[in-house]
Amino acid sequence: MDLNEKIINILSSVGLTKNLSIFILDLIPILIILLGATLGVLVIVWLERKISAAVQQRIGPEYAGPLGMIQALADGLKLVLKEDIIPAKGDPWLFSVGPALVVVPVFLSYLVVPFGHELILANLGVGILFWIALSSIAPLGLLMAGYGSNNKYSFLGGLRAAAQAISYEIPLALCVLSVALLSHSLSTVDIVEEQSKYGILGWNIWRQPIGFIAFLIASLAECERLPFDLPEAEEELVAGYQTEYCGIKFGLFYVGSYLNLLVSALFVSVLYLGGWNFSLPWINFPILLTENDFALSLNIVNATLGIAITLGKAYLFLFLSILARWTLPRVRMDQLLDLGWKFLLPVSLGNLLLTASLQLALL
């Protein structure tokens, strides 16, 4: 009897019908994504404020909870309670759909993020391409939001977001394809398993150093983080495509930005840093299939360690992105496009061709 059947039997024993039990079971992954990703955003916001304060020799959030840990929750509650205003001459449909089109694809990206061999919500054979496809939808929402606001700053911000996404989506996809060639699979689980054979020496960061650097730069640009935050440059565009937004719609953009940053960090961990595996080769807890208390306890420990290791590696990338915000100047729009088309695209394409040539030579 597998875990799903056990949960259905437990729900049926309390008086629920089998169909209702199956429906509730299908809702569990959705709740896991919503709660886990939201908690991750709260942690990232708190970390960014604390690290930013340390860089500037300040204290940062301190009074809202221990060490200011619930400051982000208070800010989110404030945005939810604010009035939702739609511009008088704007397009209400585009203005309202834009934020949802930004957040929903990012939430769906968490379906293919593995935290263990069996600890993944949807182990798709084309999982990595699924993420690339979803990440290309969000800029459409930004463009709709900018156009629907009937504001020149918002429209320019939306155009910048679309141009930036097109420029950096291609190098990002080419870097991902290079990793897929090495792993002989597009499944995120298979990519992590391929890196686990030789411990830390088997990580793709050593086999794909050029692709790793290109992936980091493209990821920062996709997340619109400094020095690539051209779509919402405060000195030039007030707040870019967010200028006319307030209340919960503005909060959706805010959450979507950090969700995208977190999922990018998780994919850095999965693609290049070995995912949930330990750094030492052949050291791992086995997944026991027997149904006794010891096996259950060991599987829980294994799953907990997998989640902790994956998040630890991901937060290393988050730390670097937060430091980059306060150490690097914002680039101009022409420099942004030149970096994407004239540098990252040739480098990532050359890296893909080199990887394919080496793989053919080893056949």
Swiss-Prot record:
Annotated GO biological process? aerobic respiration; photosynthesis, light reaction
Q: Which GO terms describe its cellular component?
A: chloroplast thylakoid membrane
Q: Which InterPro entries match?
A: NADH_UbQ_OxRdtase_su1/FPO, NADH_UbQ_OxRdtase_su1_CS
Name of the protein this chain belongs to:
NAD(P)H-quinone oxidoreductase subunit 1, chloroplastic
Q: Where in the cell is it found?
A: Plastid, Chloroplast thylakoid membrane
Read off the HAMAP family from this record. NDH1_NuoH
- Subunit relationships: NDH is composed of at least 16 different subunits, 5 of which are encoded in the nucleus.
PANTHER family given in the database record = NADH DEHYDROGENASE SUBUNIT 1 (PTHR11432), NADH-UBIQUINONE OXIDOREDUCTASE CHAIN 1 (PTHR11432:SF3)
